[in-house]
Amino acid sequence: MSNNANQEEITKNAPPAPLSPVDEEILAQVRFAAACAEEKKAENILILRLSAITEFSDYFVICSGNSTRQTQAIADEITEQLKPYKLRPLHTEGYATGDWILIDYGAFIVHIFTQSARQFYDLERLWRDAERVV
């Protein structure tokens, strides 16, 4: 095995680096957003840590609702509950249709899908190299 391949294998199997205080704060915000989604009965909530594989965002929160009305309610809950913490979305997409609502907070992005849209876009497969946060 070449040195590069050997280094890749070591890096791939290494435990994640400890989080800085700023990263801990971001993760707390991400977990709070996931808890807000859970309050509105979101299903299959998943947090992915992307910081090791991309630079555009540190985390994804991915969840599902059973209808477009529910996905919109989940989005509303998250945005309203994060406001007191001075967290406002940089951008929101898909709210009107509700099949896939994307709420971009910069350091993390919330994806709220209907069941069928989640299966179709399959972000879990697309970002399968990301660390799953418990």
Locations of the language-model features?
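Active-site cofactor/substrate anionic-group-binding motifs, chiefly glycine-
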Residues: 78-89
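Glycine/charge-rich, flexible interdomain linkers and switch-proximal surface loops
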Residues: 44-56, 90-107
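Long, contiguous binding/interaction regions
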Residues: 1-47, 52, 69, 73, ...
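Short hydrophobic/aromatic beta-strand micro-patches
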Residues: 62-64
